[in-house]
Amino acid sequence: MSRVGKKLLEIPSGVTVTLNEGNTVAVKGPKGELTRTFHPDMEIKIEDNVLTVTRPSDHKEHRALHGTTRSLLGNMVEGVSKGFERGLELVGVGYRAAKSGNKLVLNVGYSHPVEIVPEEGIEIEVPSQTKVVVKGTDKERVGAIAANIRAVRSPEPYKGKGIRYEGEVVRRKEGKSAK
């Protein structure tokens, strides 16, 4: 049995989970609504505000899907109840972030400012010129948008300049030594 898959998933108050045909699960909560279709072999049950995921056999594919399905359901429930956020820091002289309407405008050493338009359901906040926070209900999309922002100018190993995740440690390298 999968250690993750066999865990029961309690549904918090204020969150409703509906199981539709074709193994499609819709989760609704105070922060929003998420819908996802899961593999037809996975059996998802809702009993007394508890979600359980069972697998039909011990085949390698089913074992892998079991834990994955349980984790994705857990992320959906957590997303609509609490939400997810990912913080980014801008390190470098003159590196700034600003919000222009719905867009994020980054000045990170290029000859032009870089504009990033978030997807629907994703919110970008700029608490200070060197900090950016990506918020949303879908953990996967929040992480993807944060990765796209980081990819604009990923941290370089010599001076450490660039956009990094909050708390990320950039491995530094020594420069060339003169003869």
UniProtKB/Swiss-Prot annotation:
Could you tell me which InterPro entries the record lists for this protein? Answer: Ribosomal_uL6-like, Ribosomal_uL6-like_a/b-dom_sf, Ribosomal_uL6_a/b-dom, Ribosomal_uL6_bac-type, Ribosomal_uL6_CS
A GO BP entry? cytoplasmic translation
State the Pfam families in the record.
Ribosomal_L6
Which family does the UniProt entry place this protein in?
Belongs to the universal ribosomal protein uL6 family.
Q: What does this protein do?
A: This protein binds to the 23S rRNA, and is important in its secondary structure. It is located near the subunit interface in the base of the L7/L12 stalk, and near the tRNA binding site of the peptidyltransferase center.
Q: How does it assemble?
A: Part of the 50S ribosomal subunit.
* Protein name, as recorded: Large ribosomal subunit protein uL6
Gene, per the UniProt record:
rplF
